[in-house]
Amino acid sequence: MQKILVEFYDKENLENVFSLLSMTYDKVLFITFSDDKSNEAFENDEPLKRFIKRRAPHLEIGTVNVTEKKFTDIIDALSRAVNEKDAYDFDLTGGSEIVIAAIGHVVATSDNPNLSIHQYDIKTGSTVFRHPEYEILKREQSAPKLSVPEIISLHGGKAAAERNELYPNVIKLREGILKLFNAVKNCSKEWNTFCSIPFTEALNKDKMVITKSVENGNYMNVCRKIGDELEKAELITDIEIYKKNGRFYYEYTLNCKKEERFLYEKSGNILEYYTYLAATECGAYTDVCVSVEVDIDGLITQDNTDTTNEIDVMASSGHVPFCISCKNKAAINEHLYEILAVSKNYCGKYAIPVVVSNANNLPAIEKRAKAMGIVLIDNISDLTYEDFKRKLKCLI
């Protein structure tokens, strides 16, 4: 006797696979409809089929197509699909009222005694209902666990590159990340400018000497301010300001590990890695990745026309994805729309978009973010590292 899952195909792929991730089956039957073209959508849903084959390589995948989403048509299709020798488990999750009613009719009138139904709350990962037990079960702690690349692939994308693949021992850079963030956290505006100033670099006895052209008077002030903070933190040494060929230069020696050099290249890198480190160490997430470059068609090429987006920090707690955008300034409307679009496109409707900013957000932005379902964490320069970890942990 085979155990067969009957699943109504949905455009949200997490709903399509949640039962398969939670229980063991021999076969899955996806119910599709011609009138809403879900039959065509299923036929073209290669990300779903690839995901299922990776997670359950021996599972047989079948379909039952219904011409119209009518009560009698659904009953007829289900009745034809159900035989008397196998066990069938119907998933009600996300189903419309007419679908749920049709399943109830089939289960109640079928001669097959091995029919069951269940429903999940995808957000919490809990079992809401199961028949024939007729009981509401408490939240299960064994909700499915998905990695960040799995979540992206399930929704048709692919992680093109992850910075922590280039620097796999990010935890070994912990001290350097914390020291740099604490040095510049209260002068994020100047840090943004400092990192944008053109520079040259040279190697001197295994130390990197950086020279910035500071003809612009503001550049000189910025370099002095940031340089003082970095010098106090013992992150740079040998500061020298000099004039050559009528131009002023600000020169210093980086006092950091070679592997930490990238933290000084772009102003946003340090906030991203500080957030990544905190999310990793708070102990609440199944998987955490940083600087995740995502290709929506799932085909990574070297073609310059290949469209990709970057998610600063992405995490998963069980099956729930968190997409985190890191900003060295207050959040604005554009940031909200960006993270919402990226999270929905690459991680589905259950994704939780988050904006971490190192400034005080305006009340209007906070109100707008709440209406859009976006979580804001601002003024992180005022938080201790432990407080920041608690904030990230409370997202779950």
Question: Over which residues does each language-model region extend?
Answer:
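Short glycine-rich anion-binding loops that position phosphate/pyrophosphate groups of nucleotides
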Residues: 11-12, 94-96, 329
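Short glycine-rich phosphate-binding loop at a beta-alpha junction
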Residues: 87-93
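Anionic group-transfer/hydrolysis microenvironments
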Residues: 93, 312-314, 327
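Active-site beta-strand-loop-beta-strand hairpin of nuclease catalytic cores
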Residues: 314-323
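C-terminal structured interaction module
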Residues: 92, 98-101
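Short beta-strand-loop-alpha-helix junction that forms the active-site gateway
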Residues: 326-335
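Long, low-complexity, Lys/Arg-enriched
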Residues: 1-87, 101-309, 319-320, 337, ...
